[in-house]
Regions:
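Residue-level signature of outer-membrane beta-barrel architecture
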Residues: 242-244, 380-382, 393, 416, ...
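Short glycine/threonine-rich loop-to-helix capping motif typified by GTGT followed
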Residues: 666-670
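Short, well-ordered amphipathic alpha-helices
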Residues: 181, 200, 239-242, 412, ...
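Alpha-helical support elements that line or immediately flank enzyme active sites
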Residues: 196-197, 516-522, 536
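Short, small/polar-rich motifs associated with maturation and membrane association
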Residues: 1-411, 416-425, 431, 515
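Surface-exposed loop/interface segments of Gram-negative outer-membrane beta-barrel transport/assembly proteins
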Residues: 99, 175-176, 248-356, 398-403, ...
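Transmembrane beta-barrel architecture of outer-membrane proteins
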Residues: 136, 160, 235, 371-375, ...
């Protein structure tokens, strides 16, 4: 009897479950009848939802009390459809106004229609940034922004990137634009101390931005576009909105994992002559570093026949014709000073003979590099709120041995609309960036082989062509490049061996950065909104440079450290009026106040004379020299932006900003930036858009900034 009662109970509850919900199916299309793939279908007021398939169809189990389905798709107007008795619900979505008139985030986070702008603006999406696999988000968009030149300082991982927006120049050579991330200024400095670290290639701090977390990138190219940022925007502005900082909301839950790998190889090397061997005055000299000696034996007859010269093949007493004493143990090279290091290259008390011929010195020195990146993006929400989280890791091994950069980024952000007209948003990002590189910068064509820049390329590119840097001795053992007992360099008397440099000398940087913001918006009336936004951007950068004892330029060795702290706090308070006067005139006025504080501090220590091999810190040096620098700046600003539009084709805008700086004399701390711009859309005004002329606009601007 108990078994029958249990079976009856199960049947009863199953029947209740079937009655409590039903399955809705349908198709989502655009106005032309084309299916919309991946459109969101959500039960209004809940988190129950799904997305359409490749045919635009969907199937969704809904509760019995569900009353409305909400359909949405990127670039289209959302649509609410009441649920009746039918279990088939189709929806047709209309193209959104934002597609017809693109809206961009411009100065101070202001959103503006692109056709209303009286200045040049370029906008890039996340797909534009991720299309090219690059560790640096700025290099990822090189060549994609008209009028903007983006160049790297070198091919090494983590090296700096220079940006120049057309029309901006500086007597000091600083043409870097202002970076703004999620409405907060973002320091993009190259933290290099002049004279303290020669031969190193530093990163811009824009390297700390994770490309996987970029929702959009907007470049404000004119002074009129950037005037609301004041003097910092003299060279233009790059506005970045992150995925965790964007205000868009996605219905339901989406998890995206991306993984990419890019192989890197040296793109090319200079053309080298392979006609003349080491020496000078066209005479072979095993103790001379230059390539101005006798011709290689294979070229003697050709040169004499072609130019009527009287060259003869090199003959070194005691050696067969066409051979010379092994360079590593003759002349000014280390074998003549450290013969015990090269016993296998000696025979009967003298250097073994080797053919006098050119070798490929440069190519084998480099290695294949690689960029490996993984990212996880979690995005979820409903019609009133959303949450986004991005976690990523990047590793970049450079083409120069022992060169590396890496970045770990964790970002969380979200936004919510409350019932009383309030909305709140915020995001925070933590980034750890590391860089390690041998001294691959510095002067390549300096001419002084013993100079203190310590650059690998200074040493590498001017070696005699008949020297086999990457060779092996007769017993199959690679040529030694350091003394096995002391670890000192063994090479030419005025040169560090490039292989010794990449093993021992290095520059490294470890950056920890936190940035984010919180914003509160209150819609007082349909035409008046108040906004308060606060953000902070802070990082520490610990740098170390090691020059091991035993080199030519630094015989005693040197350790240099630099501890940098940088913090910026930025507060903005805005009032926005957005209304119409009749059917033809649109009016928008923004008035705001900005408070900004920047603190910067650095303490560097130079230790000379390394005491113990392998122990590389400033405390383990004979003498230390230290210095410290600190700076605190505070700025206040009042600003305004007014725009008047007529029939959606004629726009006039006025901007003004007044700054007050703590770093200027008390009697002259105020400076003013006015501006005016206009836009006239010809194709809309005269209704002349056609297949030949789809869009035409006149624009102009005048602004005082700098």
């Amino acid at each position: 009897m108990k078994k029958h009662l249990l079976s009856l109970a199960l049947i009863f509850f199953t029947a209740l479950s079937a009655i409590a919900q039903r399955t809705i199916t349908g198709k989502v299309t655009d106005s032309g009848g084309e299916p919309l793939i991946g459109a969101s279908v959500l039960v209004k007021g809940s988190s129950t939802g799904t997305v359409t398939d490749l045919d635009g169809t969907y199937s969704l189990a809904v509760a019995a009390d569900a009353s409305v389905l909400l359909f949405s798709y990127t670039g289209y107007e959302s649509k609410e459809v009441p649920l009746g008795t039918s279990n088939i619900v189709d929806a047709t979505l209309e193209e959104g106004a934002e597609q017809l008139s693109e809206v961009l985030v411009t100065a101070i986070g202001i959103e503006r229609s692109k056709k209303a702008m009286g200045y040049a603006v370029t906008n890039l999406s996340s797909s534009d940034v991720l299309q090219r696999s690059e560790a640096d988000p700025l290099r990822a968009v090189a060549g994609k922004i008209p009028g903007v030149t983006i160049t790297g300082a070198g091919g090494g991982p983590g090296t700096s990137t220079k940006i120049n927006i057309r029309g901006f120049s500086s007597l000091t050579g600083n043409t870097q634009p202002l970076f703004v991330v999620d409405g907060v200024p973002f320091d993009n400095s190259v933290n290099a101390t002049t004279g303290a670290q020669s031969g190193a290639q530093f990163s811009n701090r824009g390297f700390d931005i994770d490309p996987n977390n970029i929702e959009s990138m907007t470049v404000l190219k004119g002074a009129a576009a950037s005037a609301l940022y004041g003097s910092r925007a003299t060279n233009g502005v790059i506005v970045i909105t992150t995925k965790s900082g964007s205000k868009g909301s996605r219905k339901g839950l989406e998890v995206t994992y991306n993984s990419s790998f890019q192989s890197e190889q040296i793109s090319g090397i200079p053309d080298y002559q392979d006609v003349y061997a080491q020496g000078s005055n066209q005479v072979y000299n095993g103790g001379f570093i230059g390539n101005w000696g006798s011709p290689f034996p294979d070229h003697v007859d050709r040169l004499n026949a072609t130019y009527g010269t009287n060259y003869s093949k090199v003959i070194v007493p005691g050696y067969p014709e066409g051979t010379v004493p092994h360079p590593l143990v003759s002349g000014g090279f280390a074998g003549s000073r450290f013969p015990s290091v090269f016993p296998n290259l000696m025979k009967d008390g003298k250097a073994i003979p080797v053919p006098l011929r050119p070798y490929d010195i440069i190519g084998p020195f480099f290695r294949d590099g690689g960029l490996f990146e993984n990212s996880l993006n979690i995005n979820g929400g409903n019609e009133k709120s959303s949450l986004n989280a991005v976690v990523s890791r990047m590793n970049n091994e450079g083409i120069v041995p022992n060169s590396h950069s890496g970045r770990t980024s964790v970002s969380v952000g979200g936004n919510a609309k409350l019932d009383n007209g309030l909305s709140v948003s915020g995001n925070v990002t933590y980034v750890n960036s590391e860089q390690k590189t041998p001294p691959s910068g510095g002067s390549v064509f300096g001419g002084n082989f013993g100079s203190t820049d310590g650059s690998i390329f200074t040493r590498l590119f001017f070696l005699p062509r008949n020297f086999d840097l990457n060779g092996i001795n007769p017993e199959g053992i690679p040529y030694p490049f350091e003394n096995p007992v002391t670890g000192t360099n063994v090479f030419y008397r005025a040169l560090d061996n490039p292989l010794w440099l990449v093993k021992n000398n290095y520059f490294e940087s470890d950056v920890n950065r936190v940035y984010g913001n919180v914003a509160l918006n209150y819609d007082v009336t349909p035409w008046l909104a108040l906004t308060a936004r606060g953000g902070m951007n802070t990082y520490s950068d610990f740098q170390k440079n090691v020059k091991v004892a035993g080199g030519v330029a630094d015989a005693n060795g040197e350790v240099w450290t630099n501890d940098i702290k940088n913090t910026e706090i930025d507060l903005n308070y805005l009032a926005t009026i957005n209304t119409n006067f009749g059917e033809n005139i649109d009016f928008r006025l923004i008035a705001g106040f900005n408070w900004n504080q920047r603190s910067y501090g650095t303490r560097y220590v130079v230790g000379d004379g390394i005491i113990s091999r392998g122990l590389y810190n400033t405390n383990a040096t004979v003498t230390q020299l230290s210095d410290e620098y600190n700076r605190l700046q505070r700025f206040y600003a009042a600003y305004g932006d007014m725009q008047i539009g007529y029939k959606n084709y004629l726009y006039v805008g006025f901007t003004a900003r007044n700054d007050f700086s703590s770093t200027l004399p008390a009697a002259n701390r105020s400076y003013f930036y006015p501006g005016v711009n206009a836009s006239f859309v010809l194709t809309d005004a005269f209704d002349i858009a056609n297949n030949f002329l789809g869009y035409a606009k006149l624009r102009g601007a005048w602004t005082q900034v700098g």
